[in-house]
């Protein structure tokens, strides 16, 4: 894959975060899995715009604001980011802006308070946005005896509870550094781009998954390394760049559209 300037400018930063992600376990037609496909394999799912019709991180903006963790300025920035995300997805440049913004915003947050807020609002903010097609696909993979793993750039404190809610076996997610019970504003692991593929290969080696038989699902060109790491890549509501690659390579293209609620309203704008 050709690496553009915006990607190159952040490569060193991501290299310094490499190999420090941890796997978080949770209680757990052509594109559809069958029992004959599986022998020590797993299905790896991106989260935002693949399993759910919104950004899992930006979804919690309003409760974080209500409970004093975000300022009004943070909310305005979040609303603009949400609008851009819905219109055009997230390329490397956009993801770097979101990374920097998230690090700055969470500096000094009490970790236990974040956990409490996420737990309190999780079902209301996430369940209505789960694609019905994604829920059925998760069930099919589990019924076929395959582990379901969520691989997301969103924070572990958000992704792990969502994984538990959706019945995922484990999650791979970005992890923020916590010292003395508070977020420092620094990342210990940035689960993005090539790093997703690194962590998937690491998990496969630990658990004995046979990657040529594994599945991966994503909507974004930034997850091309993840999709290329397995033998059965599938793209879901893909952005234009990923759709072009999927078409050229003959990868199945899935269309998920059925969620319980329209997610058009940006973070902080919906009615109370």
Give residue ranges: language-model regions.
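Intrinsic low-complexity/disordered segments
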Residues: 4-5, 15
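A metal-dependent, Asp-based hydrolase signature
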Residues: 56-57, 69-140
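Active-site neighborhood of HAD-like aspartate-dependent phosphohydrolases
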Residues: 30-90
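C-terminal cap/substrate-recognition subdomain and adjoining C-terminal extension
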Residues: 13-16, 20-34, 38-40, 116, ...
């Amino acid at each position: 894959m050709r690496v553009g300037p915006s990607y190159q400018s952040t490569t060193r930063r991501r290299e310094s975060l490499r190999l420090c992600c941890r796997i978080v376990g949770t209680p757990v037609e052509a594109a559809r899995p069958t029992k004959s496909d599986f022998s020590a394999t797993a299905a790896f799912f991106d989260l935002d715009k693949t399993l759910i019709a919104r950004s899992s991180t930006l979804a919690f903006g309003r409760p974080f604001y209500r409970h004093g963790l975000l300022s009004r300025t943070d909310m305005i920035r979040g609303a603009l980011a949400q609008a851009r995300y819905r219109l055009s997805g997230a390329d490397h440049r956009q993801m770097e802006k979101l990374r920097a913004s998230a690090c700055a915003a969470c500096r000094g947050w009490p970790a236990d308070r974040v956990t409490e807020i996420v737990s309190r609002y999780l079902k209301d903010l996430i369940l209505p946005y789960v694609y019905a097609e994604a829920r059925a696909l998760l069930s099919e993979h589990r019924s076929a005896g395959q582990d379901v793993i969520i691989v997301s750039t969103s924070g572990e404190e958000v992704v792990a509870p969502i994984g538990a809610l959706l019945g995922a076996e484990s999650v791979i997610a970005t992890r923020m550094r916590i010292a003395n019970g508070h977020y420092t504003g620094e990342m210990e692991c940035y689960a993005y781009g090539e790093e997703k593929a690194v962590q998937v290969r690491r998990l496969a080696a630990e658990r004995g998954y046979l990657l040529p038989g594994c599945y991966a699902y994503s909507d974004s060109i930034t997850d091309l390394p993840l999709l290329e790491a397995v033998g059965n890549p599938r793209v879901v509501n893909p952005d234009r760049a990923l759709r072009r690659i999927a078409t050229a390579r003959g990868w199945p293209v899935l269309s998920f559209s059925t969620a319980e609620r329209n997610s058009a309203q940006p973070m902080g704008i919906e009615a109370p």
